[in-house]
């Protein structure tokens, strides 16, 4: 029988000092036999996805206490990728994921907590907490802050849905008036919550449902809706039961590595491909798998991407549907239901409720369930009122979207395409693979050949795009922006946004060893591995070299002879210590970022630390 970790600090005369300090936090004699559960919050006023979380940790903590546990809350950092975008702040975004994972480990191990409830929401916070959960392997339940309501505004006598990306595109479009740009900006992000499309934050919160570590509804139920409060209450209640299952019944199925096992990781990736999730999810799933010592790699993702259809199309791939519409159609469980009926899921998986996949679908799939309470939960909709408060409205749709032929979620037979929303490409320029969000690629661009326009940084590329130096047919190559070369693997949202604003969104391709925002669409290929700073072939591309992109056949090739590439490599390596570094780039890199770069792996490994350099 496993021993409660917390007994290390609460039992025995030699722990009198520790107990004295615990008493100073409000604990009493009766508490020293109870499980100590960490409430890992991420409240900050910097991030709209986290601005409403201040009191939600207390909500979870009170429920833990009522259920027989001891709750201890602490906070992690949280970076807003949208606010950090387009300047030096973006260098810190991905490295913050590692800091979040480490800080959770430090706090939980230093104080010997028995279990965790992770209150996350935005881009790097959910992955960082997920990495920590699988690293620590103690009982955990995730509950996120929830999605933002879609923005809405009236243009040309028509109400349209908006999000952050619309504000960015129109703000950079010289043909849009100042008045219209300001109207879109003021309407794009109306409430607290993670940005309203299938961007990185919402993608990851959906994947946590598929992994089994979050409660049904977690990925899609709006941050503003009163129904979301129940998820926080349930998380506080169920974590105590989950903790006792492990420590008092020796039930190892309660541990995250046994819930989020390889079969669950495959299901999560299948979901991601089917819903056209952010390419960043690939990076984060690979990183989490490494933390959990789960054998899940780019090879698995490539295999899955070839058989999974695109069943759910959401902004930024379409303006019609946002997360509130996904929820109305049945949310994550609704998509999983269609995937299961298509015979694509691993069924021998469980979740934090102790339910297997069949039981979960019977209870929560709107196409199967007889539970009116569940149907009411999925009818929870937006109020259209600007607010930063959680649970501030209780509006409901008059009916659910169960149209599986032309609705938000489709059956396999009526899929948006039989090819999924994400693809892994291989070729000489990406020997270890690269990622493209096919859900956002125009059908006419699935194959593309063009001359390279090479840039040593995102900033240089942006200047060229806005300066008219990039023309239709070009392949924009942005290198030395990978985990090591950036450092920090910046998101390339501004280059893709500006290509659209300059009318080049469907006539150019973009290739980078950096990554893309979940808000990116178009022929944008990222995560090129190995990256330039690690000697990847992308570092040898020259202006005018032709690059062939073939998404249907999963290929990407630099059309340059092996002899010429060998000569270029020899020339590059002759630079000695200056080899495989950007030429002429001026960038201030802090020592904190240099420390990250020293240990960072390329994107095909999840950009995690190279443990071999640490003796691991």
From Swiss-Prot:
Positions bound to [2Fe-2S] cluster: 122, 195
Annotated catalysed reactions: (2R)-2,3-dihydroxy-3-methylbutanoate = 3-methyl-2-oxobutanoate + H2O; (2R,3R)-2,3-dihydroxy-3-methylpentanoate = (S)-3-methyl-2-oxopentanoate + H2O
GO molecular function list: 2 iron, 2 sulfur cluster binding; dihydroxy-acid dehydratase activity; magnesium ion binding
Modified residues (N6-carboxylysine): 124
EC number: 4.2.1.9
Cofactor note: Binds 1 [2Fe-2S] cluster per subunit. This cluster acts as a Lewis acid cofactor.
Sorted UniProt keywords: 2Fe-2S, Amino-acid biosynthesis, Branched-chain amino acid biosynthesis, Iron, Iron-sulfur, Lyase, Magnesium, Metal-binding
Record: active site: 517 (proton acceptor)
Residues noted as binding Mg(2+) in the record, renumbered to the chain: 81, 123-124, 491
Cofactor: [2Fe-2S] cluster; Mg(2+)
Keyword Lipid metabolism appears in the UniProt entry: no
Pathway(s) it belongs to: Amino-acid biosynthesis; L-isoleucine biosynthesis; L-isoleucine from 2-oxobutanoate: step 3/4; Amino-acid biosynthesis; L-valine biosynthesis; L-valine from pyruvate: step 3/4
Cellular component aspect of the GO annotation: cytosol
Domain of life: Bacteria
NCBIfam families: ilvD, PRK12448.1
Function: Functions in the biosynthesis of branched-chain amino acids. Catalyzes the dehydration of (2R,3R)-2,3-dihydroxy-3-methylpentanoate (2,3-dihydroxy-3-methylvalerate) into 2-oxo-3-methylpentanoate (2-oxo-3-methylvalerate) and of (2R)-2,3-dihydroxy-3-methylbutanoate (2,3-dihydroxyisovalerate) into 2-oxo-3-methylbutanoate (2-oxoisovalerate), the penultimate precursor to L-isoleucine and L-valine, respectively.
Protein family (similarity comment): Belongs to the IlvD/Edd family.
Subunit-structure text: Homodimer.
Name recorded for this polypeptide: Dihydroxy-acid dehydratase
Organism: Yersinia pseudotuberculosis serotype I (strain IP32953)
């Amino acid at each position: 029988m496993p021993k409660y970790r917390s007994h290390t600090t609460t039992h025995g005369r030699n722990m009198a000092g520790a107990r004295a300090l615990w008493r100073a936090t409000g604990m009493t004699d009766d508490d020293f036999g109870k499980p100590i559960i960490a409430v890992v919050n991420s409240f900050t006023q910097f991030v709209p996805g986290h601005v409403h979380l201040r009191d939600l940790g207390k909500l979870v903590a009170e429920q833990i206490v009522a259920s027989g546990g001891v709750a201890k809350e602490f906070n992690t950092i949280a970076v807003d990728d949208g606010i950090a975008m387009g300047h030096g702040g973006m260098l810190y975004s991905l490295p913050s994921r590692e800091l979040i994972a480490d800080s959770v480990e430090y706090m939980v191990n230093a104080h010997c907590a028995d279990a965790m409830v992770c209150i996350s929401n935005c881009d790097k916070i959910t992955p960082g907490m997920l990495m920590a959960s699988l690293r620590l392997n103690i009982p955990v339940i995730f509950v996120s802050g929830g999605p933002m309501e879609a923005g809405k505004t009236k243009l040309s006598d028509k109400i349209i849905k908006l999000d952050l990306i619309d504000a960015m595109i129109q703000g950079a479009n010289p043909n849009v008036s100042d008045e219209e740009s300001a109207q879109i900006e003021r309407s794009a992000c109306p409430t607290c919550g993670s940005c309203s499309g299938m961007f990185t934050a919402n993608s990851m919160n959906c994947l946590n449902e598929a992994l089994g570590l979050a409660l049904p509804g977690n990925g899609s139920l709006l941050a503003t809706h009163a129904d979301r409060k129940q998820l926080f209450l349930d998380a506080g209640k169920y974590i105590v039961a989950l903790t006792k299952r492990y420590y008092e019944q020796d039930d190892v199925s309660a541990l995250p590595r046994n819930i989020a096992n390889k079969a669950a990781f495959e299901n999560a990736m299948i979901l991601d491909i089917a819903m056209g999730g952010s390419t960043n999810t690939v990076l984060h799933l690979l990183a989490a798998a490494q933390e959990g010592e789960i054998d899940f790699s780019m090879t698995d993702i490539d295999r899955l991407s070839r058989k999974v259809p695109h069943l759910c199309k959401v902004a930024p791939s379409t303006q019609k549907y946002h997360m509130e519409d996904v929820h109305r159609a049945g949310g994550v469980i609704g998509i999983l239901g269609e995937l299961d009926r298509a015979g694509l899921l691993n069924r021998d998986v469980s979740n934090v409720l102790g339910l297997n996949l069949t039981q979960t679908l019977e209870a929560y799939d709107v196409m199967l369930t007889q539970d009116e309470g569940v149907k009411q939960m999925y009818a929870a909709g937006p109020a259209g009122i600007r607010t930063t408060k959680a649970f501030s409205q209780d509006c409901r749709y008059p009916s659910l979207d169960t149209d599986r032929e032309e609705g938000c979620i489709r059956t396999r037979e009526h899929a948006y395409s039989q090819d999924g929303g994400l693809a892994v490409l291989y070729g000489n320029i990406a020997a270890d693979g690269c990622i493209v969000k096919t859900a956002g690629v125009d059908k006419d661009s699935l194959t593309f050949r063009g001359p390279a326009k090479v840039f040593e940084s995102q900033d240089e590329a942006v200047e060229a795009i806005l300066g008219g130096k990039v023309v239709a047919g070009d392949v924009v190559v942005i290198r030395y922006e990978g985990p090591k070369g950036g450092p920090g693997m910046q998101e390339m949202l501004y280059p893709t946004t500006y290509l659209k604003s300059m009318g080049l969104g469907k006539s150019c391709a973009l290739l980078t060893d950096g990554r893309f925002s979940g808000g990116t669409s178009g022929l944008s290929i990222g995560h090129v591995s190995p990256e330039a700073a690690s000697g990847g072939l992308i570092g040898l591309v020259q202006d005018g070299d032709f690059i062939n992109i073939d998404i249907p056949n999963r290929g990407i090739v630099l059309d340059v002879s092996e002899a010429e590439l060998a000569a270029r490599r020899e020339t590059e390596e002759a630079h000695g210590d200056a080899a495989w570094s950007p030429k002429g780039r001026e960038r201030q890199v802090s020592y904190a970022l240099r420390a990250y770069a020293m240990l960072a792996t390329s994107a095909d490994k999840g950009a995690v630390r190279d443990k071999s350099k640490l003796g691991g």
